[in-house]
């Protein structure tokens, strides 16, 4: 055991980190509420903002005191990065052997996801992130395609995203997410409401992520980088299907439910 490990474990168990996580979850919830709202607006014919994290930040920045709000969201997301990094280094002590390693790797991967969102928020707050979106995913896909076996790398990324989305659907269907709420947060009418928000939200977010993965996989299989895209492109694709607006409104409302569940989790946090 290194000298830093006891200190790291103490920080991982601290009330201060609990407060940081709560702040971060509120920020994460705000992002999902905005994405859900933009998805519904897209279904209703408003294409002024992308239904993505970047579009959500841009929409928030346009509100009164918007720049301050986006900076606040960015700080919250960086706090989530810090939490997951600490968890990856010192957490999951109740698990043993390979299971502990797996859980710490998952925590590290989540830190990367939160970091990407935090950087997006920082760019928008600094005035440099209003564009991009799906075109950036297409550019990244094109660069990957140029690598040896790049076509299969892109397809593998797509399959990984599908798997990630599937994990959200599974957690929603089985109510596995309930373990992140303290007992009080699962009891009574309010607890039932929180669980319903979590179930709908996890399934909707999982389906949206899976659709992003399908686009990446299709781009890899067909060797067409333009077929890939981020969340906005995935929702645009859904919109073009039969009954697309109805399905998109349902997905948008579900993603908003995930945002509300993040607020509930912040209130009744059980790490």
Predicted regions located by residue number:
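Cytoplasmic juxtamembrane regions at transmembrane-helix boundaries
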Residues: 3, 87-109, 172-197, 266-271
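An N-terminus-focused feature that recognizes amino-terminal "leader" regions
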Residues: 2-78, 99, 266
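Membrane-interface helix-boundary signature
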Residues: 11-27, 63-69, 96-106, 147-153, ...
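Hydrophobic alpha-helical transmembrane segments of integral membrane proteins
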Residues: 105-124, 190-212
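C-terminal functional regions that serve as terminal interaction/effector modules
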Residues: 2-8, 19, 29-38, 71, ...
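Membrane-helix interface motif
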Residues: 39-51, 121-138, 217-228
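Short, membrane-exposed interhelical loops at transmembrane-helix boundaries
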Residues: 51-61, 140-144, 187-190, 194, ...
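Hydrophobic, ordered structural segments
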Residues: 15-16, 34, 38, 64-175, ...
């Amino acid at each position: 055991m290194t000298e830093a490990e006891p200190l790291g474990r103490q920080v991982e168990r601290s009330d201060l980190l609990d407060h940081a996580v709560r702040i971060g979850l509120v920020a994460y919830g705000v992002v999902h509420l905005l994405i859900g709202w933009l998805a519904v607006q897209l279904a209703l014919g408003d294409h002024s903002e992308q239904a993505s994290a970047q579009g959500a930040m841009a929409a928030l920045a346009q509100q009164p005191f918007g720049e301050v709000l986006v900076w606040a969201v960015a700080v919250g997301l960086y706090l989530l990065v810090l939490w997951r990094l600490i968890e990856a280094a010192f957490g999951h002590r109740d698990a043993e052997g390979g299971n502990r390693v797996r859980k710490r790797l998952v925590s590290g991967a989540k830190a990367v996801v939160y970091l990407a969102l935090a950087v997006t928020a920082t760019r928008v707050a600094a005035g440099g992130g209003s564009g991009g979106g799906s075109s950036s995913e297409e550019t990244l896909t094109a660069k990957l395609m140029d690598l040896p076996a790049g076509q299969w790398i892109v397809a593998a990324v797509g399959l990984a995203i599908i798997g990630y989305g599937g994990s959200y659907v599974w957690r929603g269907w089985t109510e596995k997410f309930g373990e992140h709420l303290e007992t009080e947060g699962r009891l009574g009418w309010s607890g039932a409401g929180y669980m319903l928000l979590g179930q709908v939200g996890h399934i909707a977010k999982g389906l949206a992520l899976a659709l992003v993965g399908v686009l990446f996989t299709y781009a890899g299989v067909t060797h067409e980088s333009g077929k890939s895209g981020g969340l906005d492109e995935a929702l645009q694709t859904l919109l073009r299907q039969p009954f697309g607006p109805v399905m998109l409104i349902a997905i948008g409302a579900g993603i908003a439910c995930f945002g509300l569940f993040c607020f509930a989790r912040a209130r009744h946090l059980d790490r």
